[in-house]
Amino acid sequence: MNIGIIGLGDMGCIYAKSFLKAGYRVYGCDLPHRRELLETELGPYGIEILKDGKEVSQISDVIFYSVEAERIAEVVSQYGPYTKKGAIVAGQTSVKHPEIEAFEKYLPKDSHIITCHSLHGPGFDPKGQKMIVIPHRTTKEAYQRMTDILSSLGSILNEIADYHEHDKIVADTQAVTHMGFESMGTAWKEAGFFPWENASYLGGIDNVKILITLRIFSYKAHIYGGLAILNPYAKQQIKRYAESESELFKLMIKEEADTFRKRLYNARDFIFGQNHKPLMLNEKVMQEFSLSAGSENRKPNSHLSLLSMVDAWYHLGINPYDNLICQTPPFRLRLGIAEYLFKNEDLLEESIETALFDKTIRGDDLEFHSAVREWSSIIGYGDMEGYKQHFEQVKTFFAGRLEHGRDQSAELIRKLEIE
C-alpha cells in the first residue's frame, strides 16, 4: 500500500513519518525549492521525495493533500487529474467546502473522496489524538480500507457524514475560538504590556488565556486565516461574537447592571443549566502554569472575552458541548474556563461587578473591544493578506515568549488530560 502526501509542511511531515512507522510505503512532494532539504530530512526515514504531485498521484493508493486551504483548488487542479485509478483521496485542511469543491471538479470519477481533519497541531503525535473522517464519495469497502489505514496511526476516529456539518461545527470550535484569543493578543499588544506582568491577569483562568494565546501566535497565520475566511459558516458566528461583545461593552459603559446581569444569567442557564458532563478544569493545575515571576495579589478581571463567548453561543442557539466531537485543545480549554467561570456564582458575580464598576480594568476592555471589531472586519471583508499582517504584528510583539508559551500550553494540555 502506497501512501502519498502532497505538501510536506509541519503537518505533512508528521503524517509522513507516522504512516511510515505504521508500515506503509510513503511518497511525498512539496515546492521544488524544498526538495533537497526534504530529501535530507526525510530520506533517512525511508520516505521517498518525488518531483511533484503528478508523480505522487500516479503511484499512490491513498493520497493526502496537506496544503493551505487558500491554495487547495490550485494544487488539486494541477495534480488531481493524474490520480491513480481507484485511489482514495483526502485533504487535511480544517475547512472542507473549498476542498470538496476542488476534489469534485478535478479528480477522476473513479476516485474515492474520504477526507479527514486532524484535531491537533504539529506539536503532537497523531497517536491518541482525535481525527474527523468524512466519507463524501466512496464505497463501503474503500471506506473500511481508509479507516483501517487511519486507525493504524493510533488516532481516535470520529465520523461526520456531511462536510457541511463539519464546517458548521468547526466555525465554532476553531474559527471563533481562535479569533477570541487573537483579539486578546491584539489588545495586550495595543495596551503595550505583557499580561503576565499585570495583576489583573494572574488567576488560573487568565493563565489559560495567556498560554493559549501564545500557542496560537506561535503557529502560522495561514492556518487560522483559512479557517476564518474560507469557512462559509464562520463569518456569521464571528459576526455574532463581535455583536455580543459590543452589546455587553455598551451595557458596561452605561452601568446597566440589571440588564447586563439578566442577560448573562440567561446565557448561563441555556449553556450550563443542562445535564452535561462537566469538563471540571482544575484551579490548582491552572495556577501552576503562570508566566508571572512576581507574587502580586490577583486583581478581579471582567473576563469580557468569556462573557461574550457564552452570550454569542446563547444568541446563536449553539450548545458547545455538542461540538466536542470536533474539539481541539484551545476550544476545550476555552469551554472549560467559561464553564469554570459561569458555574462558580461567586466568581461570575465578581466578573460582572468588575465589568460594570471597576474603572481600572475598563481601558483593557476597551482595547479588547477595538481588537474584536478589527478582527471581525478583516474576516468579514475576506481580507487574507490583512489577516496575515495583523497576525504577524502581534506575533512580533510576543516573539520572545512564544516558544516557551507553546511548551507550557502543551504541558498544561497534557496535565489536564485533554489531548
Each predicted region: which residue ranges?
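NAD(P)+-binding Rossmann beta1-loop-alpha1 motif at the extreme N-terminus of oxidoreductases
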Residues: M1-E48, E55
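Rossmann-fold NAD(P) dinucleotide-binding segment
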Residues: K54-Y106
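Active-site-proximal catalytic alpha-helix in oxidoreductases
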Residues: H166-H222, P300-Y314, A371
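Interdomain hinge/lid region at the active-site interface
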Residues: E197-G294, T354-E374
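C-terminal non-catalytic accessory extensions
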Residues: L264-E419
